[in-house]
Amino acid sequence: MKIGFDNEKYLKIQSEHIKERIAQFDGKLYMELGGKLFDDHHASRVLPGFKPDSKLRMLGQLRDSIEIVIVVNAEDIEKNKVRADLCITYDEDVHRLRDEFMSRNFMVGSVVITHYNGQHAADQFRHRLEREGIKSYVHYPIDGYPHNVELIASDEGFGKNDYVETSRPLVIVTAPGPGSGKMATCLSQLYNENKRGIRAGYAKFETFPVWNLPLKHPVNIAYEAATADLNDVNMIDPFHLEAYNKTAVNYNRDIEIFPVLNALIEGIYGENPYKSPTDMGVNMIGFCISDDEVCCKASKDEIIRRFYDATNKMADGADNESEVNKIRMLFNQAKITTAFRPVTTAAYEKKLETGQQAAAIELEDGTIITAKSTPLLGCSAALLLNATKHLAEIDHQTKLIPQSLIEPVQKTKIEYLGGKNPRLHTDEVLVALSVLSNNDERSAPGDALLAENCRKALEQLPKLRGCQIHTTVMLSEVDRKIFKKLGCGLTCDPVKKK
């Protein structure tokens, strides 16, 4: 995989910048955490070289200064709101987040239940936290929030909320999902800290959009594609332009809320040290791009991947036409079509040539490998074999998995397990290669050669990380998961298997 991002530089300058921001205030900073922390695969795809856990590793350098506060909305607890990606309720996710942080030796100080209005489920949740020895606090709804600044920044507004006791200079405020009340919790703490004579600060830690890249830079367009279902829009920050006569990129929701946020901070302190929403951020990721061309290509690939992801959801019955149309519009901004990815064209051509569903992969050196569906193998499984054989310099005509082994597996799938598709999936191919790679001294010469070839093929799997793949048919969840684990950028035509 070609590298376009200096991860070590990021770990260094991002942690230093956060320290500088803490020092600007009375040694106390409340930092609202946006985006993914544990597994930011989007960032790792558009910025090759960025590790999915880079932000967590960066915060690890500040571990002794960090205290984490997890925020959850009482209304979400009452409604049993579920995280779609994890299929767990928000209250369960509070425990998951706490366990994740603590397993990495971060201090989790407490849980704040926002929008509390006597909800029974919230009371039960709080009792559970108490039994487990976890501190909890409640924050109440405020009439006219966020516009009634006079009430909000008073003892009848933020002053009614529990004061969250913290002991470390950097308080990271995170939550199971949007709408939990992270920003309001930070501002409430600023008000209550100020009453106690501490001039604490507020900052936002979000990765995208990248403020110091051009508005139409592919990295920023890829962020819009990733949030097309939310209809987020990247914009030039007008407040930053007015204050400094410099362009900076932000997104519509932060720009829209800034006048309100500005008024609230002025209501607490009498003045706001930030002139723009961009000022509030601490993101240094744009300074760590080491090869812009690599990141531009990766981001364009990601825009196309998001398009196919959206069209696949539509093929499965989702009502997401607006999401698909939004990404089509982003194609124009990025000046690309699906043909930008050579694998897309190669897979189509293979399908036209053979009359079968097909797949293609682009290896790191630019070589394109293709495969088609056969009575024995699905196109994705065949592609995995063809690619690893090429990388291992095994003759293309050499059969790694004998038909005599495949046919009994197919019989089991159809006759005993009631399946409809006899072809082997990618996971079954990998298991077969693993079994066949085992060799002992009693093996016949032909078996020994087969075992050696299977071993050599398996050893090539790490070389597939970062490679782009396209198939002309929607793959099963099993195949999708295998390619995800291998680190491949997979797209599929919105065509369901018959």
Predicted regions mapped to residue ranges:
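Residue-level structural signal for beta-strand termini and adjacent loop
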Residues: 201, 373-374
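Phosphate-handling active-site elements
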Residues: 196-200, 393-399
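A short, polar/charged loop-to-alpha-helix boundary motif
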Residues: 376-392
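Residues at the beta-strand->loop junction immediately N-terminal to the Walker
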Residues: 174-176
